[in-house]
Amino acid sequence: MSTLQRRRVNRADSGDTSSIHSSANNTKGDKIANIAVDGDDDNGTNKKIAYDPEESKLRDNINIPTLTLMEEVLLMGLRDREGYLSFWNDSISYALRGCIIIELALRGKIRILDDSARKRFDLSERLIEVIDSSKTGEVLLDETLQLMKNDEPLSISNWIDLLSGETWNLLKINYQLKQVRERLAKGLVDKGVLRTEMKNFFLFDMATHPIADASCKEAIKRRVLSVLVSRNMELSYNEYFPETTSFKIIRTLALICGSYGANVLENVLTTLEYEKRDKAISRAEEIMAQFSQYPFDLEKETELGVSVNLNKEVKEEIENNPGHDLQLEVIAGVFEVFSRMDMLL
């Protein structure tokens, strides 16, 4: 039995938002609030439109980029022309499950169970609860959310193990997410980032996914290098990652930590000189250690002279998005799992 199979386990789910109704008299017990919005009907007269405030919250307060965190990590591991991942990478599958947990937290779907006794446990051992089971439109996220919703609260590390199929619990063996890499690649094809080609490998044909839009991957690389190489971090934005993205700094840190855990970070650093590449890896490890605890240690300054403004930017981002501490605690817990992956694998 491999050491990878000695980990732990656990869950997921998804649900639908409540339907929208308008009425003249709303009672206090109504779950759906009717909020009037002025609009013009066909006759030019003003008309009131009712909508679900939960939908408005997701649309206006949580701005989601085009690509999920899992898709960005997969892109960093893909060979541009060949369109497939390294056959020797046994870390990426486990890391992608962790990225699913982070993505759900960034979207406000899950958080750490608010129990004062939780602080006796490591971050990765704290329990997760679902706070919004509405569908995201991303199949892997919705599948995971549905599993979480239907099960009791389980720890971060339990969930990553379960989604990876690393469990001895036969009742939960079906929690393993199937064909994650292939499904992510097909999602990127649908978004116009990759294309599908059939290539012959000895005796069989295999679907590969070469890069169709090189600008997307280059933008991801620039964002990573801005944090790991530049003295002052300054993120670049595009149609895939707009400036209005919620928690854009923390999402970028999650990309770096997820890529490090998936053993694909060095793919971005191949064009750098040896010394710069070594310093970038050291900075990634420094970030992993700093942000795998919560509250984040924002008083600790980097010793490498790289992205010296990172702490200030993260502090401002958290202050501008109050009330998300328990979601950020989930992210820190996954970072803790990533930091131990060498021992786990």
Curated annotation (Swiss-Prot):
Result, substituting R97A: Abolishes phosphoinositide binding and Golgi localization
Effect on the protein upon substituting K178A: Abolishes phosphoinositide binding and Golgi localization
Top-level lineage group: Eukaryota
Presence of keyword Membrane: yes
Keyword Transport attached: yes
Binding site for a 1,2-diacyl-sn-glycero-3-phospho-(1D-myo-inositol 4-phosphate): W88, R97, K178, R181
InterPro entries: GPP34-like (IPR008628), GPP34-like_sf (IPR038261)
GO biological process: endoplasmic reticulum unfolded protein response; Golgi organization; Golgi to plasma membrane protein transport; Golgi vesicle budding; protein N-linked glycosylation; protein O-linked mannosylation; protein retention in Golgi apparatus; regulation of phosphatidylinositol dephosphorylation
A single Gene Ontology CC term: nucleus
Modified residues (Phosphoserine): S14, S19
Subunit structure comment from the entry: Homotetramer. Interacts with coatomer complex. May interact with ARF1.
Note: Present with 1850 molecules/cell in log phase SD medium.
Designated name of the protein: Vacuolar protein sorting-associated protein 74
Source organism (scientific name): Saccharomyces cerevisiae (strain ATCC 204508 / S288c)
Taxonomic path: Eukaryota, Fungi, Dikarya, Ascomycota, Saccharomycotina
